[in-house]
């Protein structure tokens, strides 16, 4: 009997092979693909699907899956055209398609599994991510699709409540950690100086792994550090993996007395990121909303003390092994900076518990649970052209 075919849309990983940069969704999609490739004797066939004019897609992964590529622009206009006719269905002959990036224009949503990472666009409008448009198109789409995967119990509840989706239609599958990269290690100053592109002082540093989204509140962290420096001389520098900080913030830093203590980094490899986690006095992640919170998990796996917020999925992932900020957030950050700066906090128990907690999250487990969803959906699917 011929195996059924699962088609995975891999368009979210294309930027990685173009520029070496990828967002959180692209990164987790790539990790899932690599973990799926390590599973022997899958009861179905996997094929990777991509669409762009450069010819970049599944073949670039080097994985053993079959690959299909459409030489069409991956733009809304063209994707809407593809919904009019069963072109993907004819071309690939898939039984079920997995869309791991929240939404896609498709001809037959009833044959789709969608990974909806969160319902952020319902609560917070970020123009750069077309959240107004997503609020309009995503809810009807996911109500039509065959099944939904999301990455936290919080996100599941939020999707059910805000988009009126049947909870039986949603599977929670946590993301994982690459434990072969993110693990506790002894990191000397010499190693950090040789591996990292910033001038490290003789003291330690606080770390932030974030981006320019306002909800991440990375700007609040920087402002709090500047405010703290007005009444104390920080022992720890502030290192931010943040490629595009706003000009008004960098200008404000340039006039401060701690301008040489604040470092912005970009294009960091996973190996360098692991070193940063391991060398940090603490990781600060003051986000106001997350569907998961991967930096928390990576930091825990490296034995880094974590400071974050008790909101959205963050306390679900952090549990009782992290330090939580309170409102007002800026004052709470300053208090935490002071506590770690003056060595007045004992974090050994939380660090040890964090390493143990992070060990429960693996990409192998993520892939195995995803395969269970694939199997369930393929078992009751009827191969037909919509």
Pin down the residues of each PLM region:
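Carbohydrate transferase catalytic cores enriched for Leloir-type hexosyltransferases
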Residues: 1-386
């Amino acid at each position: 009997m011929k195996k059924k075919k699962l088609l995975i849309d891999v368009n979210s990983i294309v930027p990685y092979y173009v520029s070496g940069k990828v967002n959180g969704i692209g990164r987790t999609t790539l990790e899932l693909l690599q973990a799926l490739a390590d599973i022997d004797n899958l009861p179905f066939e996997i094929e990777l699907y991509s669409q762009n004019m450069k010819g970049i897609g599944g073949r670039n992964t080097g994985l053993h899956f079959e690959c299909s590529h459409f030489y069409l622009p991956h733009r809304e206009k063209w994707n809407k055209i593809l919904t009019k006719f069963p072109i993907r269905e004819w071309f690939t002959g898939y039984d079920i398609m997995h869309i791991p990036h929240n939404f896609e224009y498709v001809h037959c949503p009833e044959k789709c599994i969608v990974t909806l990472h969160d319902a952020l666009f319902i609560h917070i409008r970020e123009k750069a991510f077309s959240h107004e448009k997503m609020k309009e198109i995503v809810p009807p789409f996911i109500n039509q699709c065959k099944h939904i995967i999301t990455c936290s119990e919080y996100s599941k509840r939020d999707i059910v409540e805000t988009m009126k989706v049947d909870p039986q239609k949603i599977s929670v599958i946590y993301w994982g950690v690459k434990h072969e990269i993110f693990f506790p290690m002894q990191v000397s100053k010499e190693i950090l100086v040789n591996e990292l592109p910033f001038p490290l002082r003789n003291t330690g540093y606080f770390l932030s792994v974030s981006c320019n989204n306002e909800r991440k509140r990375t700007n609040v962290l920087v402002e709090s550090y500047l405010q703290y420096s007005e009444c104390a001389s920080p022992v720890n520098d502030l290192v931010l993996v943040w490629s595009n900080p706003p000009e008004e913030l960098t200008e404000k830093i340039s006039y401060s007395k701690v301008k040489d203590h604040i470092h912005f980094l970009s294009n960091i490899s996973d190996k360098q990121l692991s070193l940063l986690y391991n060398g940090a006095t603490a990781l600060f992640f003051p986000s106001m909303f997350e569907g998961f919170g991967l930096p928390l998990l990576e930091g825990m796996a490296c034995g880094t003390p974590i400071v974050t917020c008790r909101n959205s999925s963050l306390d679900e992932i952090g549990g009782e092994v992290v330090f939580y900020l309170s409102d007002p957030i800026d004052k709470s950050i300053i208090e935490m900076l002071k506590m770690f700066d003056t060595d007045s906090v004992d974090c050994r128990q939380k660090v040890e518990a964090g390493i143990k907690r992070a060990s429960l999250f693996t990409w192998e487990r993520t892939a195995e649970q995803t395969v269970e969803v694939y199997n369930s959906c393929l078992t009751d699917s009827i191969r037909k052209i919509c």
